[in-house]
Amino acid sequence: VHWTSEEKQYITSLWAKVNVGEVGGEALARLLIVYPWTQRFFASFGNLSSANAILHNAKVLAHGQKVLTSFGEAVKNLDNIKKTFAQLSELHCEKLHVDPENFKLLGNILIIVLATHFPKEFTPASQAAWTKLVNAVAHALALGYH
C-alpha cells in the first residue's frame, strides 16, 4: 500500500487521540450487535443475548481492546502491514476459521466509531485515509486463507 504523507498524518494524528479500550470495546460490541452471526466466534464470552448484555460484557470489551491494540501495530507499521499481520492471519484462518469478510465488517464499524468519537477530526480526507487503512488490514488478515 502506498501512503501519501497527508494520509499518514491523518492516521497517526487521530490514532494518538484514540482510547484503545473504549473504542476497541465499542467497535467489537457493535460488530456483535449489528452482525449477530459473528457471535458464534465468541461463544465462550458468556452472555451475548442482547445489545445491552454485549455492551457491558467484560470479555467483549477486553477482546475489543486487544483487537484495537493489534490494529495499532498497523498504524506503527504502515509500510509493512502484510508482514505485521501474517501470524494473526494464520491464527484466524487455520485455528479460528473466521470468515475473512468479518475483518471488513469490523473495519467498517471502526470507521463509524471513530467518526462518532472524533467528529471534528474525522473529515472526508481523514475518513478516506482510515478507510484505506482498514481495507489494507482486512486484506492482510485475509492472506492466510487459501
From Swiss-Prot:
The lineage of its organism: Eukaryota, Metazoa, Chordata, Craniata, Vertebrata. Residues 2-146 form the Globin domain. InterPro entries: Globin, Globin-like_sf, Globin/Proto, Hemoglobin_b, Hemoglobin_oxygen_transport. One of its GO terms (molecular function) is organic acid binding. Hemoglobin A is the major, and hemoglobin D the minor hemoglobin of this species. Red blood cells. Keywords: Heme, Iron, Metal-binding, Oxygen transport, Transport. Pfam families: Globin. It comes from Aldabrachelys gigantea. Belongs to the globin family. Signal peptide: none annotated. Hemoglobins A and D are heterotetramers of alpha-1, alpha-2 and two identical beta chains. CDD domains: Hb-beta-like (cd08925). GO terms for cellular component: blood microparticle; haptoglobin-hemoglobin complex; hemoglobin complex. Heme b binds at H63, H92. The keyword Transferase does not apply. Involved in oxygen transport from the lung to the various peripheral tissues. This is Hemoglobin A/D subunit beta. Disulfide bonds: none annotated. One of its GO terms (biological process) is hydrogen peroxide catabolic process.
